[in-house]
């Protein structure tokens, strides 16, 4: 049995490490070239792990280009894991592994098929998500389900904390099924039919904050798009600021009667610098900005952020 691995995102690292530690016959890992990975959110360096286990690492521009397809065919792989890879694989690429290719999608399929499921569930304020290990098929996220893990979402989660749990569940699900796969078995069950819409792709420009939303929606947007993603953003005093961290002030705690959405109420001051920030009114209630960064790299947090003379100023959409 000859196994291959395709991945560039950090969510694939724990699973690959566990598979290699188990002594599975991984003969090649494919990842993105550094100059391509540099523009992708959540990209991880697979070189140290491959060096540690002596596994050949191949850097590609696209998994579907002729060079990558020739490489895969030449490797003569029986089974390929595609974990932490955002590109849809072409039918010809999928056909290059004798037994098929296995991927993971960060939702409880068939719900939330499509792009950026982690970001979308946080933006929508959902309380439960999950991860699905599937056989890759020509249709997007439509292959047979091998295993699933349910993951609760708390109000304190961000895209980063959710991705940590997704990465751990990738590892756990793969290790549960690996012995069967190495015996040549093909476990899985068809997905139920779903009429739900496929989640659309997200782009950096989609992170523009709409202060006319409820405070909870603004808070959800910020935690959904924080690092390793490009971040939610807005304009104040003619400068574009990315909001990396915020706190929600619901109900009476964030009362904003008579204030326009986007108006800065003033600072939060505390001996605990991590609690310092600036309070901004939303359509109802408010959020406290805890960490912001200007386009020129100026990072404000703690006391430095609280001491900005922003009270009475308003965030706008540029």
Regions found by a protein language model. Give the residues of each.
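A short, sequence-level motif marking secondary-structure junctions
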Residues: 244-251, 291-297
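Low-complexity, glycine/alanine/valine/leucine- and proline-rich hydrophobic stretches
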Residues: 250-290
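One-carbon transfer enzymes
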Residues: 1-233, 239, 274, 281-318
């Amino acid at each position: 049995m000859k196994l291959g691995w395709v991945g560039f995102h950090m969510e694939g690292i724990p699973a690959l490490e566990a598979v290699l530690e188990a002594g599975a016959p991984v003969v090649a890992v494919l990842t993105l070239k550094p100059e391509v990975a540099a523009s992708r959110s959540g990209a991880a360096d697979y070189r140290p792990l491959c060096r540690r286990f002596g596994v050949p690492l191949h850097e590609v521009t696209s998994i579907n280009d002729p060079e990558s397809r020739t490489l895969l065919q030449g490797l003569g792989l029986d089974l390929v894991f595609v974990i932490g890879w955002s590109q849809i694989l072409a039918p010809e690429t999928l056909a290059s592994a004798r037994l098929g290719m296995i991927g993971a999608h960060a939702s409880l399929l068939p719900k939330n098929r499509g792009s950026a499921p982690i970001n979308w569930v946080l933006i929508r304020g959902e309380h439960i998500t999950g991860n699905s290990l599937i056989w890759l098929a020509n249709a997007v996220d439509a292959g047979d389900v091998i295993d699933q893990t349910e993951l609760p979402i708390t109000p304190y989660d961000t895209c980063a904390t959710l991705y940590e749990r997704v990465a751990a569940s990738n590892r756990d699900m793969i290790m549960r099924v690996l012995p069967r796969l190495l015996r040549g078995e093909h476990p899985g069950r068809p997905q139920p039919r779903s009429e739900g819409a496929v989640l659309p792709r997200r782009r950096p420009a989609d992170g523009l904050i709409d202060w006319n939303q409820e405070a909870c929606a603004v808070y959800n947007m910020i935690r959904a798009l924080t690092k390793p993603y490009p971040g939610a953003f807005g304009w104040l005093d003619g400068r574009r600021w990315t909001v990396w961290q915020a706190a929600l002030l619901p109900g009476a705690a964030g009362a904003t009667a008579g204030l326009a959405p986007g108006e800065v109420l003033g600072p939060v001051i505390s001996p605990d610098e991590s609690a310092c920030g600036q309070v901004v009114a939303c359509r109802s209630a408010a959020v406290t900005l805890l960490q912001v960064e200007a386009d020129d790299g100026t990072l404000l947090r703690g006391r430095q952020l609280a001491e900005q003379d922003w009270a009475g100023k308003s965030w706008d959409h540029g």
